Design a protein with these regions (language model features):
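Beta-propeller domains
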Residues: 1-174
Length: 174
């Protein structure tokens, strides 16, 4: 889901929007090209879609008065854990129940999988000094509590790739 919306009869609309700037899903690794870590792309990764964003992602919660369009409040979460934020999901619930927790996977940042040409394409939007080129960022599974903004992060081992969550643990579930 690209964004989530929930509302009730209290004249409030809540939009929860994950955003991942500089993740270009139209780009692919080409064999032999130079990557941002200085290595060259091998045949093992040639043809792979570039899985990494060049900046941190964010999760925004906007509260809006739907009648006037007035923004009543906004919270934005952005940190090293949201690097490569992907589409989210939530645990099954009744339609009249509010979403409590959203789950997201992240790609992290793997400098050996990002061509220098992609960084050059986005050079006006990216401060390469802020990119974790030496250390990278591991992929994660995130649990975002909408009401509080609390983020629980489950770290994946280096070299793993995590896809959108399809099994979502829930309180009281078996």
């Amino acid at each position: 889901v690209h964004f989530f919306a929930q509302w009730d009869d209290s004249e409030r609309l809540e939009l929860i929007i994950p955003h991942t700037p500089t993740l270009d899903v139209s780009e692919w690794v080409r064999e032999g090209e130079v990557m941002v870590d200085g290595s060259r792309a091998t045949s093992e990764i040639a043809g792979m879609q570039i899985p990494c964003a060049l900046t941190q992602g964010s999760i925004a919660v906007h509260t809006i008065d739907p009648r006037s369009g007035q923004l009543l409040g906004a919270r934005i979460l952005r940190n090293d854990e949201t690097w490569g934020l992907a589409l989210g999901t939530h645990a099954p619930r009744a339609q009249d129940e509010r979403i409590e927790t959203l789950f997201f996977n992240t790609s992290g940042f793997a400098p050996e999988l990002v061509p220098q040409r992609v960084l050059k394409t986005y050079q006006d939007r990216v401060d390469s000094a802020l990119m974790p080129i030496k250390t990278g960022r591991p992929p994660r599974l995130l649990a975002f509590e909408i009401a509080t903004g609390a983020l629980t992060s489950y770290l994946c081992p280096r070299g793993w790739s995590v896809l959108s969550p399809t099994f979502v643990p829930r309180r009281g579930g078996t």
